[in-house]
Regions:
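N-terminal Rossmann-like NAD(P)+-binding domain of SDR-like oxidoreductases, especially those catalyzing
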Residues: 1-113, 157, 234, 239, ...
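Glycine/proline-rich active-site loop of Rossmann-fold NAD(P)-dependent oxidoreductases
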Residues: 88, 113-129, 137-139, 144, ...
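Hydrophobic alpha-helix immediately C-terminal to the catalytic Tyr-X-X-X-Lys motif of short-chain
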Residues: 89, 93, 97, 127, ...
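A short C-terminal helix-loop "cap" of Rossmann-like NAD(P)-dependent dehydrogenase/epimerase domains
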Residues: 102, 131-143, 194-201, 215
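C-terminal "lid/loop" region of Rossmann-like NAD(P)-dependent oxidoreductases
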Residues: 146, 175-176, 184-191, 195-214, ...
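Conserved C-terminal active-site "lid" loop/helix of NAD(P)H-dependent oxidoreductases
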Residues: 156, 185-188, 203-225, 231-235, ...
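Hydrophobic "lid"/C-terminal helical patch
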Residues: 163-167, 190-193, 214, 233-240
Protein backbone atom coordinates (compact mmCIF):
# COMPACT_ATOMS: atom_id res chain seq x y z
CA UNK A 1 0.00 0.00 0.00
CA UNK A 2 2.74 2.47 0.93
CA UNK A 3 4.63 1.65 -2.27
CA UNK A 4 1.68 2.89 -4.36
CA UNK A 5 1.52 6.15 -2.42
CA UNK A 6 5.21 6.73 -3.03
CA UNK A 7 5.01 7.14 -6.81
CA UNK A 8 6.19 10.54 -8.12
CA UNK A 9 6.65 12.15 -4.71
CA UNK A 10 9.11 14.94 -3.90
CA UNK A 11 8.33 15.47 -0.21
CA UNK A 12 7.03 13.23 2.55
CA UNK A 13 5.45 14.75 5.65
CA UNK A 14 5.31 11.95 8.20
CA UNK A 15 2.55 12.93 10.63
CA UNK A 16 0.86 9.52 10.84
CA UNK A 17 0.92 7.90 14.26
CA UNK A 18 -0.90 7.10 17.46
CA UNK A 19 -1.18 9.88 20.04
CA UNK A 20 -2.46 10.12 23.65
CA UNK A 21 -0.80 9.06 26.88
CA UNK A 22 -3.23 6.65 28.55
CA UNK A 23 -3.80 4.32 25.57
CA UNK A 24 -0.03 4.13 25.09
CA UNK A 25 0.30 2.89 28.68
CA UNK A 26 -2.48 0.35 28.24
CA UNK A 27 -1.63 -0.82 24.71
CA UNK A 28 2.11 -0.24 24.16
CA UNK A 29 2.31 -2.87 21.40
CA UNK A 30 0.03 -0.79 19.18
CA UNK A 31 2.20 2.27 19.71
CA UNK A 32 5.44 0.47 18.92
CA UNK A 33 3.99 -1.07 15.77
CA UNK A 34 2.60 2.24 14.51
CA UNK A 35 5.05 4.87 15.73
CA UNK A 36 8.30 2.90 15.57
CA UNK A 37 7.86 0.22 12.91
CA UNK A 38 5.72 2.63 10.88
CA UNK A 39 8.50 5.22 10.98
CA UNK A 40 11.04 2.60 9.95
CA UNK A 41 8.88 1.74 6.93
CA UNK A 42 8.63 5.41 5.94
CA UNK A 43 12.39 5.94 6.30
CA UNK A 44 13.09 2.81 4.25
CA UNK A 45 10.72 3.73 1.43
CA UNK A 46 11.80 7.38 1.36
CA UNK A 47 15.34 6.18 0.75
CA UNK A 48 14.38 3.54 -1.83
CA UNK A 49 12.16 5.96 -3.78
CA UNK A 50 14.71 8.80 -3.71
CA UNK A 51 12.35 11.23 -2.02
CA UNK A 52 13.91 14.69 -2.04
CA UNK A 53 13.05 15.44 1.58
CA UNK A 54 11.20 13.80 4.45
CA UNK A 55 9.88 15.81 7.40
CA UNK A 56 9.11 13.91 10.60
CA UNK A 57 6.57 15.19 13.13
CA UNK A 58 8.34 14.53 16.43
CA UNK A 59 7.01 15.29 19.89
CA UNK A 60 8.32 17.61 22.57
CA UNK A 61 7.19 14.95 25.05
CA UNK A 62 10.60 13.35 24.43
CA UNK A 63 12.06 15.90 26.88
CA UNK A 64 10.05 14.48 29.77
CA UNK A 65 10.37 16.97 32.62
CA UNK A 66 13.07 19.35 31.33
CA UNK A 67 15.76 20.99 33.42
CA UNK A 68 16.02 24.10 31.22
CA UNK A 69 13.50 26.67 29.97
CA UNK A 70 13.21 27.55 27.23
CA UNK A 71 14.24 24.01 26.32
CA UNK A 72 16.84 23.64 23.52
CA UNK A 73 17.18 20.66 21.19
CA UNK A 74 20.38 19.71 23.04
CA UNK A 75 18.45 19.09 26.28
CA UNK A 76 18.41 15.57 27.67
CA UNK A 77 15.62 13.38 26.34
CA UNK A 78 13.78 11.48 29.05
CA UNK A 79 10.44 10.15 27.75
CA UNK A 80 8.10 9.26 30.63
CA UNK A 81 5.45 7.08 28.94
CA UNK A 82 5.21 4.82 25.85
CA UNK A 83 3.77 7.47 23.53
CA UNK A 84 6.71 9.79 24.21
CA UNK A 85 9.17 6.92 23.90
CA UNK A 86 7.81 5.65 20.59
CA UNK A 87 7.81 9.13 19.04
CA UNK A 88 11.41 9.59 20.17
CA UNK A 89 12.43 6.20 18.76
CA UNK A 90 10.80 7.11 15.45
CA UNK A 91 12.88 10.28 15.39
CA UNK A 92 16.05 8.33 16.11
CA UNK A 93 15.34 6.02 13.17
CA UNK A 94 15.17 9.01 10.82
CA UNK A 95 18.31 10.58 12.25
CA UNK A 96 20.14 7.26 11.88
CA UNK A 97 18.99 6.92 8.27
CA UNK A 98 20.25 10.44 7.65
CA UNK A 99 23.64 9.68 9.19
CA UNK A 100 24.20 6.24 7.66
CA UNK A 101 22.27 6.33 4.37
CA UNK A 102 22.25 10.10 3.74
CA UNK A 103 18.46 10.28 3.76
CA UNK A 104 17.41 13.93 3.46
CA UNK A 105 15.27 14.37 6.55
CA UNK A 106 14.42 16.91 9.22
CA UNK A 107 12.66 16.26 12.51
CA UNK A 108 10.36 18.92 13.94
CA UNK A 109 9.68 18.59 17.67
CA UNK A 110 6.22 20.06 18.07
CA UNK A 111 5.05 21.80 21.24
CA UNK A 112 1.36 21.72 22.26
CA UNK A 113 -0.18 22.23 18.82
CA UNK A 114 -3.78 23.46 18.66
CA UNK A 115 -6.13 24.81 16.01
CA UNK A 116 -9.29 24.19 13.96
CA UNK A 117 -9.93 20.69 12.62
CA UNK A 118 -8.19 19.11 15.59
CA UNK A 119 -9.40 15.64 16.48
CA UNK A 120 -12.69 15.85 18.38
CA UNK A 121 -13.07 12.19 19.32
CA UNK A 122 -11.12 9.59 21.21
CA UNK A 123 -9.57 9.35 24.64
CA UNK A 124 -9.10 12.00 27.30
CA UNK A 125 -6.17 14.16 26.28
CA UNK A 126 -5.29 17.61 24.96
CA UNK A 127 -6.57 20.47 27.06
CA UNK A 128 -8.06 22.45 24.15
CA UNK A 129 -10.34 19.61 23.09
CA UNK A 130 -11.46 18.98 26.66
CA UNK A 131 -12.16 22.65 27.37
CA UNK A 132 -13.95 23.43 24.10
CA UNK A 133 -16.39 20.54 24.51
CA UNK A 134 -17.03 21.69 28.08
CA UNK A 135 -17.60 25.29 27.00
CA UNK A 136 -20.03 24.25 24.28
CA UNK A 137 -22.00 22.20 26.81
CA UNK A 138 -21.95 24.98 29.41
CA UNK A 139 -19.97 22.84 31.83
CA UNK A 140 -17.06 23.89 34.08
CA UNK A 141 -13.51 23.59 32.80
CA UNK A 142 -11.67 20.73 34.52
CA UNK A 143 -8.33 22.33 35.34
CA UNK A 144 -5.50 20.02 36.41
CA UNK A 145 -3.93 21.16 39.68
CA UNK A 146 -4.11 24.88 40.35
CA UNK A 147 -3.79 25.84 36.68
CA UNK A 148 -0.47 27.65 37.12
CA UNK A 149 1.34 25.07 35.01
CA UNK A 150 2.33 26.56 31.66
CA UNK A 151 2.24 25.21 28.13
CA UNK A 152 3.82 26.36 24.88
CA UNK A 153 0.55 26.51 22.94
CA UNK A 154 1.48 26.66 19.23
CA UNK A 155 -1.10 27.45 16.56
CA UNK A 156 -1.52 25.00 13.72
CA UNK A 157 -0.92 27.49 10.89
CA UNK A 158 2.50 28.33 12.35
CA UNK A 159 3.28 24.61 12.49
CA UNK A 160 2.17 24.08 8.88
CA UNK A 161 4.42 26.91 7.79
CA UNK A 162 7.34 25.30 9.61
CA UNK A 163 6.76 22.04 7.73
CA UNK A 164 6.63 23.81 4.37
CA UNK A 165 9.76 25.88 5.02
CA UNK A 166 11.58 22.76 6.22
CA UNK A 167 10.63 20.86 3.07
CA UNK A 168 11.81 23.70 0.84
CA UNK A 169 15.15 23.99 2.61
CA UNK A 170 18.44 22.25 1.83
CA UNK A 171 18.95 21.35 5.48
CA UNK A 172 19.16 17.69 6.51
CA UNK A 173 19.85 15.57 9.56
CA UNK A 174 18.71 18.23 12.02
CA UNK A 175 16.23 18.25 14.90
CA UNK A 176 14.31 21.51 15.32
CA UNK A 177 11.90 22.70 18.00
CA UNK A 178 8.65 24.26 16.81
CA UNK A 179 6.95 26.39 19.46
CA UNK A 180 5.14 29.66 20.00
CA UNK A 181 8.08 31.55 21.46
CA UNK A 182 6.16 31.83 24.72
CA UNK A 183 4.60 29.77 27.50
CA UNK A 184 1.17 30.36 29.00
CA UNK A 185 -0.57 29.36 32.21
CA UNK A 186 -3.55 27.07 31.76
CA UNK A 187 -5.38 29.69 33.84
CA UNK A 188 -4.66 32.18 31.05
CA UNK A 189 -6.36 29.86 28.57
CA UNK A 190 -9.35 29.56 30.90
CA UNK A 191 -9.61 33.35 31.16
CA UNK A 192 -9.68 33.65 27.37
CA UNK A 193 -12.31 30.93 27.00
CA UNK A 194 -14.35 32.36 29.90
CA UNK A 195 -16.19 29.97 32.18
CA UNK A 196 -16.35 28.36 35.62
CA UNK A 197 -13.61 26.01 36.82
CA UNK A 198 -13.33 22.74 38.73
CA UNK A 199 -9.82 21.77 39.84
CA UNK A 200 -8.84 18.11 39.56
CA UNK A 201 -5.75 16.28 40.91
CA UNK A 202 -2.41 16.97 39.31
CA UNK A 203 -1.10 14.04 37.29
CA UNK A 204 2.31 12.37 37.70
CA UNK A 205 5.06 12.55 35.04
CA UNK A 206 3.71 15.81 33.61
CA UNK A 207 5.99 18.86 33.45
CA UNK A 208 5.00 22.06 35.20
CA UNK A 209 6.15 23.91 32.12
CA UNK A 210 6.73 23.36 28.41
CA UNK A 211 8.59 26.11 26.60
CA UNK A 212 10.51 25.60 23.35
CA UNK A 213 13.77 27.33 22.60
CA UNK A 214 13.17 28.17 18.94
CA UNK A 215 16.51 29.89 18.33
CA UNK A 216 17.76 27.08 16.10
CA UNK A 217 14.85 26.93 13.66
CA UNK A 218 14.83 30.71 13.43
CA UNK A 219 18.55 30.79 12.67
CA UNK A 220 18.66 27.86 10.22
CA UNK A 221 15.31 28.25 8.45
CA UNK A 222 14.22 31.80 9.24
CA UNK A 223 10.97 30.51 10.75
CA UNK A 224 9.21 32.23 13.61
CA UNK A 225 5.64 31.99 14.96
CA UNK A 226 3.08 34.60 13.96
CA UNK A 227 -0.13 33.73 15.84
CA UNK A 228 -0.54 34.83 19.47
CA UNK A 229 -2.53 32.80 21.97
CA UNK A 230 -5.25 35.45 22.00
CA UNK A 231 -5.57 35.28 18.20
CA UNK A 232 -5.50 31.49 18.18
CA UNK A 233 -8.16 31.14 20.86
CA UNK A 234 -10.40 33.59 18.99
CA UNK A 235 -10.17 31.36 15.91
CA UNK A 236 -10.94 28.28 18.01
CA UNK A 237 -14.06 29.93 19.42
CA UNK A 238 -15.22 30.69 15.88
CA UNK A 239 -15.07 26.93 15.27
CA UNK A 240 -16.66 25.95 18.59
CA UNK A 241 -19.43 23.94 16.90
CA UNK A 242 -16.80 21.51 15.64
CA UNK A 243 -16.82 20.06 19.17
CA UNK A 244 -20.58 19.39 19.34
CA UNK A 245 -20.03 15.62 19.03
CA UNK A 246 -16.80 15.51 21.03
CA UNK A 247 -16.65 13.51 24.29
CA UNK A 248 -17.72 15.58 27.28
CA UNK A 249 -15.39 14.98 30.20
CA UNK A 250 -16.44 15.52 33.82
CA UNK A 251 -14.49 14.72 36.99
CA UNK A 252 -15.82 11.16 37.28
CA UNK A 253 -15.08 10.29 33.66
CA UNK A 254 -11.61 11.81 33.90
CA UNK A 255 -10.87 9.84 37.07
CA UNK A 256 -11.83 6.62 35.30
CA UNK A 257 -9.93 7.49 32.12
CA UNK A 258 -6.70 8.31 33.96
CA UNK A 259 -6.51 5.33 36.35
CA UNK A 260 -3.69 3.75 34.36
CA UNK A 261 -1.86 7.09 34.33
CA UNK A 262 -1.81 7.26 38.13
CA UNK A 263 -1.21 3.52 38.55
CA UNK A 264 1.90 3.28 36.37
CA UNK A 265 3.38 6.78 36.47
CA UNK A 266 2.89 7.73 40.12
CA UNK A 267 6.45 6.70 41.01
CA UNK A 268 7.99 7.76 37.68
CA UNK A 269 11.40 9.41 38.05
Amino acid sequence: MLEKIYSNIDWVFHLAGLADIVPSIEFPDNYFQTNVIGSYNIAKLSLEKNVKRTIYAASSSCYGIPDFFPTPETAKCDPRYPYALTKYLGEQIFMHWSSVYRLNVLSLRLFNVYGPRARTSGTYGAVFGVFLAQKLAGKPFTVVGDGTQTRDFTFVSDVCRAFLIAAQSQLSGEILNVGSGNTYEVNKLVSLLEGPVINIPKRPAEPDQTFADITKINKLLGWKPEVSLEEGVAVMLEHLQDWKDAPLWDTNKIEGATKSWFKYLADSH
